[in-house]
Regions:
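A generic, residue-level signal for flexible/boundary positions that often mark functional hotspots
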Residues: 101-102, 168, 182
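A general structural motif
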Residues: 133-135, 166, 192
Length: 235
């Protein structure tokens, strides 16, 4: 279990230094990470990539500390064959407990339920290693922070380390903040796909799309990229 207080304290301290309200803390951190791992970071050289990240880690030191803690926490979870949704935990603690859940109808799927649903759906041992699933799309049209997709990816990857990456994951949600969270979760776990911010009942024009892990850097790094495509403002 992660230390939520550690994250919340650092988030609130950085936003206070930036002159931003506490309510924006999680969104500001997500924006920071999306910039840190933007496709714009790669100019064709390892030095350019390192300089991009170093500049941003130094510009907001408290967010930099949190970024390193986040990467480490997710890495340790994946080493145990698990997925980790730090953003979802913080969102529930910082926002939904303050009454937003009852107003918006947002209730995040518990990890145990996500894992159970993934095991029921299951890709199956034979299917997970079969060429016929190459490029198969897995979609969640009310994805939130992406827990069901994370669970599916880890379940598939248990059978074959690279099996999860044969899937294309598509997440949709109408909440701009949780779309950011979902994009970062998919990126750091090594998934391929995109996150679409739109009303899936009305199939509205996406306000923004996140393309996950399109770039494969020609040097050793476990973390990939996010490309952001802006659309029409959400109505």
């Amino acid at each position: 279990m992660i230390n939520k207080k550690f994250y919340i304290d650092y988030l609130s301290q950085q936003t206070k230094e930036d002159g931003r309200p506490y309510e924006t803390a999680l969104s500001d951190f997500c924006d920071y990470l999306l910039d840190l791992f933007s496709v714009k970071a790669f100019d064709g050289t390892l030095d350019g990539f390192k300089n991009w990240q170093q500049q941003r880690l130094q510009a907001k030191p408290k967010f930099g500390v949190l970024a390193m803690a986040w990467l480490n926490d997710v890495s340790q979870a994946m080493d145990r064959g698990q997925w980790l949704d730090v953003f979802g935990m913080l969102y529930e603690d910082m926002y939904l407990t303050a009454g937003k859940a009852s107003k918006t109808g947002q209730f995040f799927t518990p990890q145990s339920v996500s894992d159970l649903m993934s095991s029921i759906i299951g890709s199956g041992k034979n299917e997970a290693t079969s060429a016929k699933i190459e490029g198969t799309t897995v979609n969640d049209c009310a994805a939130g922070s992406g827990r069901l997709l994370l669970a599916h990816f880890i379940e598939a990857s248990k059978l074959n380390h690279s099996a999860g990456r044969t899937f294309q994951y598509v997440a949709q949600d109408s909440d701009p903040l949780v779309c950011k969270m979902c994009a970062l979760n998919m990126m750091v776990h090594g998934m391929n796909g995109r996150v679409i911010c739109q009303d899936t009942l009305a199939m509205s024009t996406p306000s923004v799309e996140y393309f996950i892990n399109e770039v494969r850097y020609p040097f050793s790094t476990p973390y990939y990229s996010v490309r952001i495509k802006s659309g029409n403002p959400a109505k």
